[in-house]
Amino acid sequence: MNECHYDKHMDFFYNRSNTDTVDDWTGTKLVIVLCVGTFFCLFIFFSNSLVIAAVIKNRKFHFPFYYLLANLAAADFFAGIAYVFLMFNTGPVSKTLTVNRWFLRQGLLDSSLTASLTNLLVIAVERHMSIMRMRVHSNLTKKRVTLLILLVWAIAIFMGAVPTLGWNCLCNISACSSLAPIYSRSYLVFWTVSNLMAFLIMVVVYLRIYVYVKRKTNVLSPHTSGSISRRRTPMKLMKTVMTVLGAFVVCWTPGLVVLLLDGLNCRQCGVQHVKRWFLLLALLNSVVNPIIYSYKDEDMYGTMKKMICCFSQENPERRPSRIPSTVLSRSDTGSQYIEDSISQGAVCNKSTS
């Protein structure tokens, strides 16, 4: 029967995994990582709070897509909390942690990733429902959106708690990983592979929607008389969502690959030398998301700017490169326009034949 080590401190597990946490987290490297991490976290709290407040304040954003976007901002805000907790419980402090405190530290990080990933999956479903029906916004009710948001956080909390619930190596030291000394290598493989598969599924779904919208836009454009901005609205919205997805994949994939290599017990891969920099890269994702929202959406930018600078609502600054949310947020108007475009296109094709 294997001996369990619930009462041990983390120095016992770090020493067995040959992880030199003290040397790596002292001196210039530690100062750089902590300074950059602190700046990122402050920006995450500020910018994502603005996004959530903008969705609450501006009635143009009171639609399912923007509610889910606000929830993604909430997930990024939660990621900032997780990284702050990590910064206060890392370096030389890591070896003094109890098992339960270390589980909490890692569980917060795991939950933040799962919340963002699951939320992107829900947004993919919402976009698929609306675009395939040629509507700017889906017909999800507020009740259903609320249930989806609660489901996102329930899944995130559960995934973050799985190691604490028993999938760990406290009773089987030989199965412990190197980067996460009390996580089983089998759990790391499961967790990373499931996340990478979710990445792949999302990329395929969004590419399918993107190709569909692009094809429909090209077919309908010659037969419709609406403004260019309105004709291109579905494509612009898809480009915004795909930019968010692309940033998420780029920022998180390297870290997941490193964890997968550790789970596969790759001793020659040098995972210890890059883990902290890839962790900062993952943190960067929560930094760039609010920038993407404000850059791509004209009204989001205007609302956030007015909250910061107290500018007059009657004279918002215009930036033509962004999506006019007055078009995006009027679901019935946008949907009717697309439906009218389909009808006009059908009439033109019929008369031509």
Swiss-Prot record:
Does Transmembrane helix count among this protein's keywords? yes
Q: Might you name a Gene Ontology BP term for this protein?
A: collateral sprouting
Extracellular topology ranges? 1-31, 89-101, 168-186, 262-276
Would I find Nucleotide-binding among this entry's keywords?
no
**SUPFAM superfamilies in UniProt:** Family A G protein-coupled receptor-like
**Lipid attachment points, S-palmitoyl cysteine kind?**
C309
User: What residues form the membrane-spanning segments?
Assistant: 32-52, 68-88, 102-124, 147-167, 187-207, 241-261, 277-297
In terms of PROSITE patterns, this protein maps to: G_PROTEIN_RECEP_F1_1 (PS00237), G_PROTEIN_RECEP_F1_2 (PS50262)
Spell out the coiled coil positions from the record.
none
Q: Where in the cell is it found?
A: Cell membrane
Q: What family classification does the UniProt entry report for this protein?
A: Belongs to the G-protein coupled receptor 1 family.
Q: What function is annotated for this protein?
A: Receptor for lysophosphatidic acid (LPA), a mediator of diverse cellular activities. May play a role in the development of ovarian cancer. Seems to be coupled to the G(i)/G(o) and G(q) families of heteromeric G proteins.
Q: What is this protein called?
A: Lysophosphatidic acid receptor 3
The species is Homo sapiens (Human)
